[in-house]
């Protein structure tokens, strides 16, 4: 019985001791500049730009006992304040609208994932993924 109590105290001590180290290694939820691809059906090229997106660590808890009567809500790093910008894709055919609107993160927050504005899947595509030919904003092909 004493061994179990001492083991629990040691585990608790290590958690308290290592928590500041763990927190300092993880980036907080904040806007970061990221390579993002912009493409549209009907246009043959994918434009690659740098834009602020929300990224970082949000504290979450996974309950040990999962009750069928309670719901677990996981918080993710997502947009708090956002501005939308428009850019023109090159080489689009004359009958298609070459303009694409994309979000620019002004501030971020740890909150529930909004399926209307965010990709809430576990294994999503990277922000710079392109289906069509990639073109950098300075005109160089990838």
UniProtKB/Swiss-Prot annotation:
Q: Which CDD domains match?
A: GHB_like
Pfam annotation, one family: Cys_knot
Any one Gene Ontology BP term: androstenedione secretion
Q: What pairs make up the disulfide bonds? A: 29-77, 43-92, 46-130, 54-108, 58-110, 113-120
Sample GO molecular function, one term: hormone activity
Q: Which UniProt keywords apply?
A: Disulfide bond, Glycoprotein, Hormone, Secreted, Signal
Q: Name one GO cellular component term.
A: extracellular space
Write the signal peptide boundaries.
Answer: 1-23
InterPro entries recorded for this chain?
Cystine-knot_cytokine, Glyco_hormone_CN, Gonadotropin_bsu, Gonadotropin_bsu_CS
Q: Which SUPFAM superfamilies match?
A: Cystine-knot cytokines
Known glycosylation sites = 33
Question: Where is it located?
Answer: Secreted
This protein's source sits in the domain of life called: Eukaryota
Predominant subcellular localization, coarse grouping: secreted
Functional description taken from the UniProt entry: Involved in gametogenesis and steroidogenesis.
Q: Which family does it belong to?
A: Belongs to the glycoprotein hormones subunit beta family.
**Assembly:** Heterodimer of an alpha and a beta chain.
This chain belongs to the protein called: Gonadotropin subunit beta-2
Per the UniProt entry, what species is this protein from, by scientific name? Answer: Oncorhynchus tshawytscha (Chinook salmon)
Gene name, please? cgbb
